[in-house]
Amino acid sequence: MVVETIERSCEGSKRRHVNGGDIAVPCSGEECSNGDINVAPGVSAKRARVSREMTFEDIYGADALLNDDDDEDDDCDWEPVQAPMEFVKWCCVNCTMSNPGDMVHCCICGEHKESGILRHGYLASPFFKDTGLIEVEEKYGGSSSATSSTAVGFDERMLLHSEFEVKAQPHPERPDRLRAIAASLATAGVFPGRCLPINAREITKQELQMVHTSEHVDAVDTTSQLLYSYFTSDTYANEYSARAARLAAGLCADLATDIFTGRVKNGFALVRPPGHHAGVRHAMGFCLHNNAAVAALVAQAAGAKKVLIVDWDVHHGNGTQEIFEQNKSVLYISLHRHEGGNFYPGTGAADEVGSNGGEGYCVNVPWSCGGVGDKDYIFAFQHVVLPIASAFSPDFVIISAGFDAARGDPLGCCDVTPAGYSRMTQMLGDLCGGKMLVILEGGYNLRSISASATAVIKVLLGENPENELPIATTPSVAGLQTVLDVLNIQLEFWPSLAISYSKLLSELEARLIENKKNQMKRKVVRVPTWWKWGRKKLLYNFLSARMISRSK
């Protein structure tokens, strides 16, 4: 792998943290002076006289009058009424979008410019400046002891992985993602508190080579010797990135072992950089090492014969699919925005089912448009994910939990809520006795990812998800069509889907007929042509009569 390196002097390159915004250069006294127009009394009287005596006919011959010697002197004394002002720009801590300095709330997501989201997560008010919010800490916080067997993997050294260059708009995959989730969990008393922490370790090169080539592992390690580098235009690394990636993979590996061997019931890997785009020999899409793939193979080394990976990140996990597309012992199911290959990374069509004996063990649910929400996801779970997963009968379940399909995410532009994520987690919890590892992938709206991650962990702790979503859901027409396309392809490998496919096909036909009828009802009723011409003739006769009467 070739690492693209950019040399740059260290001098003057340190970041300054000013609420994620640009630092404005203050205007000098001369630039910001509020100059008035100083005019001599005689000149003022002359201008007033010219103003009174000027007519439209005089305009064309007034050049000499307006450009005499006295007025040339006036031009020397002229100053602008007000000098141009430079506005300080600030970037929203929640969604990274830039805003004018005179605005208090983000014009995109409405977050306060001094929001307390990094201290309290989604529990902080988006509309007010952070003032401590002691009442929030008292309501949700506490010193509850860890009474469950849900483990959380987290290490602060992963926060050191960040983009070195100071840019006008922050990179969406930034350390604040983990800070916001950790703040939500701490304020709610979930972690630390009700969850078990596990010690972090750096994964070994031998473990990584179960997934990646030695050249790829060496390329990532090389970045620790560089001030900053890029694998692709959007996949950065600094001197701490390689260690952060090893810590993330090591936490996922140890959580997988502890869950499968029964030391803990389930777990959540609060890690970065994400991993599902990282393939056998390449890093891309913000990802360096494939954490989910490492966890799956470590679980198999611990005794799991069959592993299920469900990837609900809004982007297709092309790296995970590449690693396991020929492996019948790992079933990979991905639900992602696709749009016919026009949405990043462009892979993950429904007909990508695996190869070389692994056909049927790659299941892609590619949404054809943005805006997909809870109903479509849960519908796909009911008719695709759970039937195939039940037939596969896994020993261990991994969720590649990207929260960029969440409502308000700047990259995903979909509409899944925390209630939707918690419901999907609960639906998968009935498989293999609840042996489940949830691994953080994407998600770039801090308020959305912190609320969604907290909702998922509460389900792992045994809490019931919010009852806002009905068990039986009606998908959008686009969602129903996508599910039918997937079922039609996967029928060859999972015959038990035949009954569901026939039923849904009839439902789609009924929906299309109903939509056609509604469109016909909404058509505008057109008036007869003779009536329109009759009105015109009546108006013509009326106006003609009035004109004739006036001319007499």
From Swiss-Prot:
Keyword Disulfide bond: no
Signal peptide: none
Molecular function, one GO term: zinc ion binding
Catalyzed chemical reaction(s): N(6)-acetyl-L-lysyl-[histone] + H2O = L-lysyl-[histone] + acetate
Activity regulation remarks: Inhibited by trichostatin A (TSA), a well-known histone deacetylase inhibitor.
Cofactor(s) annotated in UniProt: Zn(2+)
Chain segments annotated as coiled-coil in the UniProt record: none
Keyword vocabulary terms for this entry: Chromatin regulator, Cytoplasm, Developmental protein, Growth regulation, Hydrolase, Metal-binding, Nucleus, Repressor, Transcription, Transcription regulation, Zinc, Zinc-finger
Summary of the tissues where the protein is detected: Expressed in stems, leaves, flowers, siliques and mature seeds.
Cofactor notes: Binds 1 zinc ion per subunit.
Gene Ontology cellular component list: cytoplasm; nucleus
Family indicated by similarity: Belongs to the histone deacetylase family. HD type 2 subfamily.
Function (record text): Responsible for the deacetylation of lysine residues on the N-terminal part of the core histones (H2A, H2B, H3 and H4). Histone deacetylation gives a tag for epigenetic repression and plays an important role in transcriptional regulation, cell cycle progression and developmental events. Histone deacetylases act via the formation of large multiprotein complexes. Represses chlorophyll biosynthesis and photosynthesis in the dark. Is recruited by PIF3 to the promoters of chlorophyll biosynthetic and photosynthetic genes, and represses their transcription by histone deacetylation.
Protein name (record): Histone deacetylase 15
Naturally occurring in which organism (per UniProt): Arabidopsis thaliana (Mouse-ear cress)
Gene: HDA15
